[in-house]
Amino acid sequence: LLVALALPISVEAAASAYEKEIKPVLKERCYACHGALKQKAGLRVDTVAFIKEASVIASGDPEKSELVQRIRSNDEEERMPPEGHALTQVEVKAIMDWITAGALAPEGERPEDDPLEHWAFQKIERPDIPKVDDISHPVDALLAAKQKDRGIIPVAAVDRKLAIRRLYLDLIGLPPTRGQLEDNRPWEAIVDELLASPQHGERWARHWMDVWRYSDWYGLGAQLRYSQRHLWHWRDWIVESLNENAGYDSMVRAMLAGDELFPDNPDQVRATGFLARNYFLFNRTTWLDNTIEHTGKAFLGLTINCAKCHDHKYDPISAVDYYRFRAIFEPHQVRLDPLPGDADLDKNGLPRVFDDNLEAVTYVHQRGDEKKPDKETKIDPQVPEFLSAFASPIKKIKLPLPAYAPGSSKWVQEAQLEAAKKRVEKATAELVKAETTTEEAASQMDLAKLKWEAARAEHKSVEATIAADQFRFANPGKSNEDLFRTAAKTQVAAVLARSKVERLGTDAKKKKAAREAKKKAEERLAQLDKGKVEYDSLRVTRKALE
């Protein structure tokens, strides 16, 4: 009789131990590979029934249970789970005790839900709108129906003045004046006026900039470590887009692909500041990790970054999905482009993304370790599999010349010539001033003369380079040795002239850099003398990491 009375208690205790001690461990360490999303080796462990069906436990005898043998194994190829640390002795003992007690399960145990069945991954369908008295707006009707079902009585409508105050604060972030509180125009007219206000874009841009992680650049001194210089251009684009009532979908496309969708429209290319903001100086993988993480969070509401080292614990995102997503961004880089009216990129410039290396290859990093790429398999760019049915086919596009060679634009060439001309004028003025000083300032005159010579050499180099570029861009694949050789020689002369100036300075780092530049220029000159004609196209942009 005592045994009979004790038996149900033991069964209940064993089932309770499973719920409290065993199932949480299985969920944390095993479901990712043996749950609803994936069943490696045909094993699923999210219910006791599935575990027993796979014959990996021998009820009452843990020593003969394959499950126990695998979690206790010292062989890395055999031990489960394969990632992370082994189960603790306490966790292993709890599993063995549970098996010894008969591997009992709680009554009515249900398997975990398939993440793909979650409403967030279902096709969007327009719901039926319930008919509710005195309510015309669909959202209000849906809310009212739910409130009625749950016995919730909504608060009464507020008076007009309070409603106007709330409207102002919501749409433009500013309180109304006393006169505006007395506005008797139709409600819709007030709403339209506030939506047309420039403050509307400024007020709501603040929230979107938080979601999209707007941040000005920062680093050490002049060194750029995070974000990009002049990123305020992206900020302005956000404000302007909201004020122009741009659709959310069009804004997302512009932020992710504005350089390809609008290659000859700098106003729209500003949107790619979203990607440029993720720049990180010290590690390319960290840079791309940030891009993947915050693109997923901002536009999908998903933590794709959790699948870098292993399949996602609870969302239908595999580790391969993570690297397919990375492959989309693998070729991209960031650069500063010149803007009309200012050739000095330190003062102004357009931070933007561009495809720098279309041949860049993506590999899976084993367990997320960038030092262990699996080079057996090349990963192609693609969205996560659960989105593949919606994905557009990848197509090659042809960009206009100024998009990939900004130096080919006439206004850019003119701006570079004007900047070089002003440097000559400034150096000339300094030389004239030095020549009128006393003999004690002879060293200053020597330096002023070198600066003047360097400015003139740089001006000639810009002129020759533009001439060579104009032929090169107008005649793809053809060569003009005279133009190319002149451009190359003037470039070398400009470097040598500038290195003389820097070597006379007091900055040790600049002097060292000048000596190295001089050495390279002389080597290049020697190559020219041997008949090897190569010149550098006009450099008007500044690429990240340069």
Briefly describe each language-model feature range.
Residues 1-10:
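Bacterial N-terminal signal peptides
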Residues 26, 299-305:
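Short metal-coordination and nucleic-acid-contact micro-motifs, chiefly zinc-binding Cys/His arrays
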Residues 31, 307, 326:
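Cys/His/Pro-rich metal-binding microdomains
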Residues 250, 264-265:
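Extracellular glycan-recognition modules
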